[in-house]
Structures are given as C-alpha cells and as structure tokens.
C-alpha cells in the first residue's frame, strides 16, 4: 500500500502478482527464508506469498497491526522485504522504509516514486545495497478504497545486499558548459514542462527561470548539437521528477554526451578516411 498525504492507495493484486513473478525469476528467491510485506494494506503481495505482513491500518485479517518503522526487527540472512511502502512528501517515507528494510534484509523489492531512478535520490539509499533491477510501471498501479483507479508515476526496483559507491552528481561538461549569462552562451535548454530538454538558439527570447543556458565548447560541437539534439528522447528522465516534468543538468549531460561522443567520433573517422 502507498500512502500519500494521508490518502490510502492500494496496489492492484494483478500488479503485485506480476512483480512477484519478476522477483521469483532470480535464483535467490527460492532460498528466501523470511519474506516481509511492511505496509500491506489489503494484502496485495502478502496474500500471494508465504510471508509476514504489517500495516498500521490493516485491511486483511492476516495482516498484523503494527508500525514497521518502529518494530525491533533484526537482520537475518535470506530475508526479502517486498511491497509498496507509503511515499510521503518527496518520497521521504519511502526512503525511510528503504533504510529500515536494508537493515534487516538481503533483498528489498519495492514499488517506489519514479524519482528513485534519479542518481541524487539513489545516493540517499544506504550504500550497503545495490540496484539489481528496475522497471517503470504504468500509471494504473493503484486503486482507491472505493475501487477507482489512481494514477501515480512509479517504478519497481529490486535492491540486493552488495556494497556500492555513491553516484557522482557533477555534470560532465566535456562538450558544453552551463553558464549564467545568455551573452556568453549558444543555446537555451528547456528545464521544466512538456518540452523539457528542447534546444533553442540563444537568439530566441527565453526565460532563464525555465531554461538552462549552455555554451558549446567548440564550433564543431555547436554544429553537432544543432543538427542532432532532436534525436534525444527526454521522456523517461523528465517523468522521473516528484512534481512537474523537469530535467537536471546531470540528466542533460548523461543523455547528450553519449550522442555527441558518437557523432564527433564518426566525424573524425570520416576525415581520416
């Protein structure tokens, strides 16, 4: 169950079944000797698994009334925590459930806000676990208590007990540089809204509050950006925000650099030949 701003949204049983099957596809699932659903709601996951289920407001007789975050649970090898935690403001409760679960489990499989795909959010997740699998879900994961569907942007992630390092959050400005004044720049890049990621020439009239200002690091890079920027699909990263569609500087370099690398490398090869 996800709880957002004190409203209860329950996971569809069909969705839970599909996600359980994804977890079962891993060899370790067969040796999971303790499975916990920490915020079980109507029991979408626990009713389809042999597991321990908790919820502060259970809607199924097999779910224990308890606050998972306050329970004195100990780590045990072979533990899997699976389900759909409450999200809270900006995913704060979901992160709390992640941290608690990773203290006691080898594997954590949760439906989470799509913002958990962002490197900045993943850096807040304990470094004891690494992301093993993720799948962006359709918007119709939830139903309300009255049975109506509720649309929320979510992702299903499986994390395994395997240490990792934090992501670097510094944009790699190898091809272009983010600047503060448009007088020093070549392009605008839309930061928010439906057209997030769109490139415009600096001569166009744009608002700095909704755009990044970018200077290409060479004339050839500027030409490549003008010709090929439209090939970049910004849909996935723009939808990973908590609120309105938006992209970060890191999103831009992560998306644009591989394309520019390929184009400029091919250009050099053509010149050599």
Where are the regions a protein language model picked out?
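Class I S-adenosyl-L-methionine-dependent methyltransferase catalytic core
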Residues: 1-273
């Amino acid at each position: 169950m996800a709880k957002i701003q004190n409203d209860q949204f329950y996971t569809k049983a069909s969705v839970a079944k599909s996600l359980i099957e994804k977890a079962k596809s891993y060899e370790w699932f067969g040796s999971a000797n303790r499975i916990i659903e920490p915020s079980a709601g109507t029991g979408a996951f626990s009713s389809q698994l042999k597991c321990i289920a908790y919820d502060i407001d259970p809607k199924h007789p097999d779910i224990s009334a308890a606050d998972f975050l306050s329970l004195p649970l100990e780590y045990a090898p072979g533990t899997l925590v699976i389900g759909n935690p409450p999200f809270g403001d900006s995913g704060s409760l979901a992160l709390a459930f992640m941290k608690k679960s990773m203290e006691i489990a080898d594997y954590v499989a949760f439906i989470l806000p799509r913002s958990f795909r962002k490197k900045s959010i993943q850096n807040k997740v304990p470094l004891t676990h690494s992301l093993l699998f993720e799948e962006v879900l359709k918007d119709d994961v939830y139903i309300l208590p009255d049975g109506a569907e509720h649309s929320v942007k979510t992702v299903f992630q499986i994390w395994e007990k395997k240490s990792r390092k934090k992501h670097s959050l510094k944009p790699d400005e190898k091809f272009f540089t983010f600047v503060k004044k448009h007088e020093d720049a070549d392009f605008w890049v839309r930061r928010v809204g439906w057209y997030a990621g769109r490139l415009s020439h600096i001569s166009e009239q744009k608002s700095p509050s909704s755009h990044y200002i970018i200077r290409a690091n060479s004339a050839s890079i500027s030409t490549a950006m003008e010709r090929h920027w439209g090939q970049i699909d910004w849909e996935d990263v723009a939808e990973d925000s908590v609120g309105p569609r938006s992209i970060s500087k890191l999103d831009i370099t992560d998306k644009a650099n591989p394309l520019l690398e390929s184009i400029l490398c091919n250009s050099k090869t053509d010149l050599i030949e």
